């Protein structure tokens, strides 16, 4: 009992600050739908840090990173085999081939979105629904060629940029890089979630 209470308490402590109103509302919808027995699947991003952890020092507010994962993520079930590729940038080429319309994308940056499932049980209900949280990483952890040349910072640069997508909830957007990061977060969430929905549909019904 004490171990379970410690687990629940630590997890609640990690998640109880830094969440936005819309995220809280979506969580309530998931909880209510599951309690009523409705089949629902939710999608979001597996953020490493919340907005901030606040302390008052000598009467002044001090902001510190709020690490949501520092005590682990025991409730999440990672599914690396179901990871999807999300492509950023590049060019799309279109052409006709034998009367069929075809496309190809070149010059893009590839980011891998890995799903982590959180299962939600309903109050006074036998229903269990799933919330899928996406984490972002590069297909390769670092550039071996750059590392071999002694360019160690550049060897890790691309992976760091990819991981930044799922690093912080609500990054500051009062500058151009912050706006770009928020757009990348939104694009990763939409692209990976739609791919997951379509893949699951095709697996069960074999056609759109």
Report the location of each language-model feature.
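Single conserved hydrophobic/aromatic residue that forms the stacking wall/gate
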Residues: 1-9, 13-14
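Short coil/turn segments at secondary-structure boundaries
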Residues: 9-11, 43-45, 147, 207-208
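Extended, regular secondary-structure scaffolds
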Residues: 19, 35-117
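Flexible loop/turn segments at secondary-structure boundaries
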Residues: 24-27, 47-56, 139-143, 201-204
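Long, basic N-terminal domains or extensions that often function
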Residues: 32
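Active-site cores of enzymes that catalyze phosphoryl transfer or operate on phosphate-rich substrates
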Residues: 78-208
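Active-site rim elements
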Residues: 17-19, 181
């Amino acid at each position: 009992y004490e171990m379970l209470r410690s687990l629940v308490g630590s997890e609640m402590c990690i998640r109880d600050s830094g969440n936005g109103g819309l995220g809280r509302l979506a969580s309530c919808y998931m909880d209510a739908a599951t309690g009523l027995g409705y089949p629902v699947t939710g999608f979001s991003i597996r953020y490493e840090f919340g907005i901030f952890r606040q302390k008052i020092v000598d009467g002044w507010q001090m902001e510190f990173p709020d690490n949501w994962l520092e005590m682990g993520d025991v409730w999440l079930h990672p599914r690396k085999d179901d990871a999807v590729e999300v492509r950023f940038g590049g060019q799309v080429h279109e052409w006709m081939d034998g009367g069929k319309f075809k496309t190809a994308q070149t010059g893009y940056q590839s980011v891998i979105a890995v799903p982590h499932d959180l299962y939600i049980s309903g109050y006074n209900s036998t229903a269990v629904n799933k919330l899928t949280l996406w984490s972002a990483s590069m297909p390769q952890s670092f550039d071996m060629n750059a590392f071999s040349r002694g360019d160690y910072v550049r060897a890790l640069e691309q992976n760091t940029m990819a991981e930044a997508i799922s690093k912080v909830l609500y990054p500051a957007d009062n500058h151009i890089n912050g706006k770009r990061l928020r757009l990348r977060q939104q694009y990763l969430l939409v692209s990976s979630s739609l791919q997951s929905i379509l893949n699951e549909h095709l697996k069960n019904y074999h056609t759109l």
